[in-house]
Amino acid sequence: MSHAPSEETHIRVLIADDDRAFLSSLQVLIDRQPELAVIGTALDGLEAIELADDLDPDAVVIDLHMPLLDGVSAAARLRRDHPNLCLIALTGDDAPALHRAVREAGADEVLLKSELVEGLLVRLAAARARS
């Protein structure tokens, strides 16, 4: 699903998470920041890749455990196809091997969902330097 960004937006963000309630909350959090706007949301890894190709976001926030294509595989494809993208992985899973795998796949950051409020906005603001 795509969303129209405001004209004042500096960082265009795509969010991918299969938990609709979490996705909605995250969208509200990001859209409340004047320098950020959610331009699309995806419920699985394949949809995230398709939307990234269509919408050309500055940043993607992606869950690691999703249907159709997991976040690690989606991150690898996103990094390959969009090398300048700010790619932030979100997960509730604190397994070091999973975090290592998604970093190796191309994620710039891995955040636990429990760290969301403190860490995500800081990292998305850093995307400004990349765009």
Please describe what each predicted stretch is.
Residues 55-61:
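Active-site beta3 strand of CheY-like receiver
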Residues 66:
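Receiver (REC) domain active-site loop signature in two-component systems and cognate sites
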Residues 9-30:
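Conserved acidic segment of CheY-like receiver
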Residues 50, 72-84:
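Short amphipathic alpha-helix used as the core "switch/output" element in two-component signaling
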